């Protein structure tokens, strides 16, 4: 019998290892297919990826209602293209979750 908490920790570690930086221009094919999902900077990208993986509809709906998680809009994509925006990315098939890299 598997331990749900241990399974979640393993999935979280896997998602963390699969997180990478990419420039927006590299992600254009995914955007063109409607597969890029914006994650607001105040959210933890890995926690959002876990919510997608575990189909946590309630929390995803809450974030969507707050504008914190949503498909990347055309206007945002244009701004990121012009700025050659760097983004943190993680794939949760079929989605590519993206979060702007914060300059400190």
Q: What is the predicted function of each stretch?
A:
Residues 31, 64, 81-82:
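Alpha-helix boundary recognition
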Residues 41-43, 64-68, 94-96:
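Generic secondary-structure microfeatures
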């Amino acid at each position: 019998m598997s331990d749900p908490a241990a399974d979640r920790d393993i999935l979280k570690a896997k998602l963390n290892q699969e997180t990478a930086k990419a420039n927006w221009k590299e992600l254009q094919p995914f955007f063109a297919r409607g597969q890029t999902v914006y994650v607001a900077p105040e959210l933890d990208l890995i926690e959002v990826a876990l919510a997608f993986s575990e189909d946590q509809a309630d929390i995803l709906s809450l974030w969507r209602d707050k504008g914190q998680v949503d498909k990347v809009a055309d206007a945002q994509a244009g701004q990121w293209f012009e700025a050659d925006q760097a983004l943190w990315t993680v794939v949760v098939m079929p989605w590519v979750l993206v979060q702007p890299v914060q300059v400190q």
